[in-house]
Amino acid sequence: QNAQTNAMAQEPVLNMPVAQQRRASEPAAPYIGQLVTKISVKGNKITKAEDIEAVVTTKPGMQLTQEGLAKDLHAIYGLGWYYDLQPEFTKVPEGVQLTYHVLENPVYKKLEVEGNTKISTSEIEKILDLPKDQIININDVNIKVQRLEAEYNKQGYILARVADIRMLPDGTLLLLVNEGIVEDFKVKGNVKTKDYVITREMKLKKGEPFNAKDARRSMQRIYNRGYFE
């Protein structure tokens, strides 16, 4: 008797939602408490089954538990190489055989970036420094994205964030960047001085990404005009 979850997702994602973990665990219910006689991995073409076997806590000879299975699924995703994972349970006289069906992330081919105006795509590619023609690792991407956000911060764009990361089946890594656009200025507390007299001194412009360095310079220019104490 075999029990396997529904068809795996067709489009890669760079995380494992809690709901997806729950769905992956559901078929285990009839086998909880039974002895695990064998663990195997299928679907891996580049990565090694031994890497998965090394991180799972449920071993042959142990009882299958819901908590242990959930922990193991999380650990396998935590390796960063897979965008989908489904456990299969096969009933045998001695207990149950457990097979992990994995789908590896695509091989990285090219980078596309949307929303970037202050750091060019070519410069972002250098900052990320991801190896091409190799299977993408989610953990590596997340670390490199933090490096990109740190570079934005260094340049003064402290509100800039990578809002979304997508790995497309053709090997394209797509980054959606939100640089923290200034939508408007509001001036409060000025009784005698008109708003435009203050805002014209601002180096920051509406529709441009917020820059902390420009904001400080703008405030200094306003104070230097002697409008305020």
Question: Which residues make up each language-model segment?
Answer:
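Periplasmic polypeptide-binding modules associated with outer-membrane biogenesis and secretion
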Residues: 2-229
